[in-house]
């Protein structure tokens, strides 16, 4: 996405960058389609991004010099010209449908054409380790708020407000749920399995986490122990702290899994403990790339390394600031 993309669009697409929560061995495909009106600046901008698991594999941007569906993963370059032409035409058709929907929603909400408005559509499917359908999902948002969603039964709709009820009634009369269910349970699964085969060297790999525990003295006689997991794939991982074998779920700080920028992920969990009691606490790491769960403790450095340890402590605030960017 270019640096000049509307802030609203950036916020709505940020969800796509968050790792999906999946069952071990399961895989998902998701598309995010977004249209943003910009009065006085021409037609609405329309963007599609497609993800297999946590990997972006296709993208369309109506603001591109030559708007086309394009590969965003090396393994997608195996698809031929017919595929890209078909997907480009589908994207352009959806773009026009979104333009109509933006005008329709202005009427539903009694809004003027002078303001900028946004529609986002997310849909996709998930399969288990055996390649069989697990679930499908499809939902719309308008101006950053839920609008209408297909329920998990893929037969009924949840409308978020009075305007969305109008849409729900129209779609119930048209049998839209049946149409979408047929796609999600069959065609979506077929394409997901195809993409998993094309990208199997990347998508089906398992990179075990590199782990360690760091030690950060506090100002009140306590210590923060932070358990790090770095460089792992896929994104699904569990970190827990235990005190003498009992989990400390309530007392633990746990950050969301973050992309590392190289196709792997990072995560940490921390707990505040009394000074001198560090050895009573253990970090436990669960990931499908590990032959068995890991158990870690903080290992105090030898006394001869105390100076280097102090220098390392001084450097941690820079790393912490980087992590929260």
UniProtKB/Swiss-Prot annotation:
Domain of life: Eukaryota
Keyword Membrane: yes
Region described as Alpha-3: 207-298
Region (Alpha-2): 115-206
Membrane topology annotation: Single-pass type I membrane protein
A GO biological process held by the record: antigen processing and presentation of peptide antigen via MHC class I
S-S pairs: 125-188, 227-283
GO CC entries: extracellular space; lumenal side of endoplasmic reticulum membrane; MHC class I protein complex; phagocytic vesicle membrane
Entry-listed glycosylation sites: 110, 280
Signal peptide stretch: 1-24
Keyword Nucleotidyltransferase: no
InterPro entries: Ig-like_dom, Ig-like_dom_sf, Ig-like_fold, Ig/MHC_CS, Ig_C1-set, MHC_class-I_related, MHC_I-like_Ag-recog, MHC_I-like_Ag-recog_sf
Region (Alpha-1): 25-114
Keywords: Disulfide bond, Glycoprotein, Immunity, Membrane, MHC I, Signal, Transmembrane, Transmembrane helix
PANTHER family: HLA CLASS I HISTOCOMPATIBILITY ANTIGEN, C ALPHA CHAIN, MHC CLASS I-RELATED
UniProt protein name: H-2 class I histocompatibility antigen, Q10 alpha chain
Species, as recorded: Mus musculus (Mouse)
Source organism phylogeny: Eukaryota, Metazoa, Chordata, Craniata, Vertebrata
